Regions:
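Hydrophobic helical h-region of N-terminal Sec-dependent signal peptides
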Residues: 2, 6-11
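N-terminal helix-rich structural modules
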Residues: 14-165, 431, 465, 471, ...
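C-terminal, non-catalytic "cap/extension" segments appended to globular domains
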Residues: 41-51, 69-74, 182-185, 319, ...
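Contiguous, non-catalytic segments that form substrate-binding/exosite surfaces or channel walls
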Residues: 107, 153-304, 309-313, 526, ...
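Glycine- and acidic
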Residues: 149-156, 188, 239-247, 275, ...
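Post-HExxH zinc-binding segment in Zn-dependent metallohydrolases
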Residues: 202-212, 342-384
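Active-site-adjacent bridging/hinge elements
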Residues: 229-236, 290-302, 322-333, 378-391, ...
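Active-site recognition of the HExxH zinc-binding catalytic motif
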Residues: 314-333, 349-353
Length: 546
């Protein structure tokens, strides 16, 4: 066995080793391990040991390695793809450096949240803080929902916000230590997008949709909750979007078969381009995470989705979103790891939202009704079928949901987080011209505008917990814009019922083939339109008018 080894060594003597290969291989192995562990934590309740996975990787996430890749991304003579891959990798390193350095604050906040309980007068025992989202969405009484939020705010005020204030200051300092002018600059580099232009567009969208949004709020809140618009509060939106009147149309075990039917109409199966099946864990395990999630363990061959079957459209919508991630991972053909796993999230989140947004479209809702009818016959079930009036009402509820989140992210989140993260006032000049020195007051003002409901102090105390690290909020805002753009583009190319077009499925596979190398602007060019919120506005107005 010695001779072949000596021959290999001799052949490699003249080849200079790639100084970037080692960190890349180390990161690939680390991400593989982390995602596999996350899968078992989510599906069977294994104790999370993510922190331990970073042990021994200090050099990988050091300032020196980050600086090396930052310099390498500017190197002359490399291909455009290699440059972009290096940029993605450098942004990954910088983000992980911040995450590790601020992990102690996340751990403190997480532990404080896990240990915290609140007293609700109508409940015998203290209620865990972590269960309040579920409780407020299930609570039928508006007064009690407000009390739940007030109790939650006390935990935020006393236990969580002081910790998160320290985290914010530390993150801003660390960004400057890495050579960035600010935390905002680091975040824009990570998202590969500029905040200012999208904030301008977000404000335009907010103003343009204000009358439509308020009319829908008045109509839908009265019908779904029996609450006049003047009495609606932020604490009511969780219950509103849970759509309790329509829950009977979406039994807990319908998620996987209905999603496969959704894909099947477009000629997409739930298999990978490597020939393997997308692995779906839909077991009812009491220890599993209740929210659906997706992992591209090895792209494209090992793609996994976790879902804990729950009734209702809110749960089903989340599964469709995660199914969008799975379809992207499963149909990615690029061999470049950075394009498989790293980079901005706008495309993968956008595909997920495109699938979720189908639930506002009466065309898909009628297809779903036909699916349930066939499913009943095949499985000898008797699940109720939506009437045409049910479809109309559910569509309008979903239109409101989509408007709400676009106004929240494209306007309120971006303005607020630009200020919170120490951005230059030039970012929000002309978009928000009121005082910004008090973050809690600012939060209360911009979110009250976005939601079109008054916000009290208990609502405003969310100003530390309602924050996305490194402006993932920008990825979300861009993904919402992309989802509407893709939905309108598909409709223009393949007709109103593009859900039944195999050509639409082919186009989706083409869009995702290069993974995250394809950015939102690239998709907009494919459909021949600028990347902005005008397709979203047009689609929502069209659906309201139908």
């Amino acid at each position: 066995m010695l001779a072949p080894l000596l021959l290999v060594s001799a052949l490699n003597l003249g080849a200079a080793p790639d100084p970037l290969a080692g960190p890349r291989a180390e990161a690939q192995a680390l991400v593989l391990i982390q995602q596999t562990l996350q899968w078992y934590t989510a599906t069977v309740g294994e104790t999370s040991i993510q922190a331990e996975t970073y042990l021994g990787h200090d050099r990988l996430f050091s300032k020196e390695t980050i600086a090396r890749f930052r310099k390498a991304a500017k190197e002359k003579g490399i291909s455009a793809d290699e440059r972009r891959a290096r940029e993605y990798f450098q942004a990954y390193l910088a983000g992980e450096y911040l995450s590790q350095s601020t992990a102690k604050y996340d751990d403190k906040a997480q532990n404080a949240a896990l240990q915290a309980t609140v007293r609700l007068p109508w409940m015998k025992d203290p209620v865990p803080y972590k269960q309040l989202d579920l409780i407020v969405a299930d609570e039928k009484d508006a007064g009690r929902r407000a009390e739940i939020e007030k109790a939650r705010s006390e935990i935020q005020k006393t236990a969580l916000n002081p910790i998160l204030a320290e985290k914010e200051a530390t993150a801003q300092r660390l960004a400057r230590e890495l050579g960035y002018r600010s935390y905002v600059e680091l975040s824009e580099e990570s998202r590969r997008a500029q905040l200012r232009p999208f904030m301008v567009e977000g404000k335009r969208f907010l103003d343009a949709t204000d009358a439509m949004f308020k009319e829908l709020v008045a109509e839908v809140s009265q019908r779904e909750l029996g609450i006049p618009a003047a009495q609606l509060r932020r604490s009511d939106f969780n219950r509103l979007f849970k759509a309790p009147r329509h829950e009977r149309f979406f039994p807990a075990d319908i998620a996987v078969p209905s999603f496969k039917a959704f894909l099947g109409g477009m000629g997409i199966d739930f298999k990978t381009v490597a020939g393997t099946e997308v692995r779906v864990d839909d077991a009812v395990n009491p220890l599993k995470e209740p929210r659906a999630a997706c992992w591209g363990i090895r792209v494209p061959s090992d793609v996994r989705v976790n879902v804990k079957p729950l009734p209702g459209l809110d749960s089903l919508g989340v599964f469709f979103h995660e199914g969008g991630h799975a379809v992207m991972f499963a149909n990615t053909t690029t061999k470049v790891w950075e394009f498989q796993q790293l980079g901005p999230g706008a495309l993968t989140e956008g595909l997920g939202e495109t699938f979720r947004y189908a639930w506002a479209d009466p065309v898909w809702l009628r297809r779903y009704r036909s699916f349930v009818q066939a499913h009943n016959a095949e499985a000898k079930r008797n699940d109720p079928l939506m009437s045409d009036q049910d479809i109309r009402e559910l569509s309008r509820l979903q239109i409101l949901y989509q408007l709400y989140y676009l106004r929240r992210y494209a306007y309120a989140k971006l303005v607020y987080e630009s200020v919170l993260h120490g951005g230059s006032p030039s970012l929000w000049k002309g978009i928000y011209d009121r005082p910004t020195s008090d973050p809690m007051a600012l939060y209360r003002d911009v979110f009250s505008t976005a939601y079109a409901v008054p916000m009290d102090e208990s609502d405003a105390l969310r100003f530390r917990t309602d924050v996305d690290d490194t402006f993932y909020s920008l990825d979300y805002a861009r993904s919402f814009a992309l989802a509407h753009l893709m939905s309108e583009g598909m409709r223009a190319k393949f007709g109103a019922d593009w859900y039944g077009s195999p050509e639409a499925g082919k186009l989706i596979r083409t869009i995702v083939a290069e993974g995250n190398k394809t950015e939102a602007e690239d998709v907009a060019k494919l459909f021949g339109v600028p990347f902005d919120l005008r397709p979203a506005e047009a689609r929502l107005r069209r659906l309201v008018a139908e």
